[in-house]
Amino acid sequence: MMTCVALAQENHSYRFSLEDCLHFAVANSYERKSMELTGKSLETTYEQSKQQRLPNLSASVGQNFSNNENGWSTSGSVGVGSSVTIYQGGNINNTIEQNRLNLERNEVQLERYDNQLATQILQSFLTVLGNQELLNYQLEVLNTSREQLKQGQSRHKVGAILESDLLLLEAQYYSDSNNVVDTRINIENNLLDLKVLLSMNPTDDLEIISPDTDNLDGLKESLPTEEEAISLAMEYMPDLRMSDYDIRLAEKSVDMARGNYFPSVSANANLGMGVLAFDGDGNSNWYGKPTESVGVSMSIPIYSRGQTKANVKKSRIALEQAQLDYEQSVLSVRQTVVQAYRDVVSAFNAYKVSQVKENAYSKSFNAYNIQYQYGTITTVELLQQQNNYLNVLNSYIQNKYSLVMKRKILDIYMGKEISL
């Protein structure tokens, strides 16, 4: 009989700032945990490789049974042996160093993953913020549209406006209502995307804490010069440090390949002796004397059918490739940072322009709304101004959060802590 048990996962509620999101993601990311396990494995390999400098030690025990014309007899032996590699072309030290570099490279790779994850979370978080701010404006516009429709219905009853004007007001109200619904759906989808990045249960409740974004002039004031930004990024960017580790690992591979040209020297020591034996008549005696041996052996490579030479050549080619990759990484980092820096400058200018336009169109829309109440402008003129205001508002919110995102991405490149 099979019993099926349904495990209901408990839902949680979270109220997170951007910093909270970053900390939660680092603690719960399955991919990051997998990379940490890889690091533990590399650390184990490194620690074990250091033990290769030490001699090994083994023991042996043997017991024999034989049957002859006198009956059964037994005999046995015990022994202890040890060996140690004295010299192997430097490959023991090279292997240790190679394993250490692999371990450190994995730590830098983990930093790069954290940066990539932080960038994705930042983008998703700001998308939620932008849509939430847009929703607040849309709700204000919807309330205005509702009042306009009520006034229009009253004025239509007394013949102050045409039916076509009333229909335009109704259409605008339902259009604004639909915008609110669409934005709310977008926010829910944005939050779901953010939960995925946080490795959070999709059914958990997540509320984000909105920072103060009314004045973003400080983002420009704290901006370093372009050369300073490049210099900071060149020191911090994990991509460059990983490329540097790749060069050092390739150099060790060359050393290890060249080590096969040299002889290897090892030493060994053994101690053995016989044990008590019984013959078929029940007599016992010790037999044999303890045997001791100490030896040193040397293996000298003479001819390997060109294998060692080929391995050295291929390792040097790999080193040259690693050096080329590093130079390419340097160029890519410089290009990326320069582009990111100029994107920030451009985004700030776009934000300031859209900020001025939003303020102007907001006041203009309010003025048009008052004029419409007194009947000095037509319905078409009012709705045209309202739609112009909505377009400018959308552009303002997009430029606002685009500036924040681009500025914070530049901070990530420069190795600065991310906060809003």
Describe the residue ranges of each PLM region.
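Small/polar, glycine/serine/threonine/aspartate-rich low-complexity segments that form flexible
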Residues: 9-14, 60-88, 95-97, 211-222, ...
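Acidic, low-complexity, intrinsically disordered peripheral segments
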Residues: 8-11, 19, 202, 395-420
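Amphipathic alpha-helical coiled-coil segments
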Residues: 22, 34-49, 113, 117-137, ...
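A glycine-/polar-enriched beta->alpha junction
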Residues: 23-33, 40-55, 80-98, 108-115, ...
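Bacterial Sec-pathway N-terminal export signals of envelope proteins
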Residues: 7-58, 202, 208-248, 418
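Membrane-embedded beta-strand positions of outer-membrane beta-barrel proteins
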Residues: 35, 57-61, 99, 243, ...
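Periplasmic alpha-helical coiled-coil/stalk elements that build and connect Gram-negative outer-membrane
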Residues: 116-232, 343, 347, 389
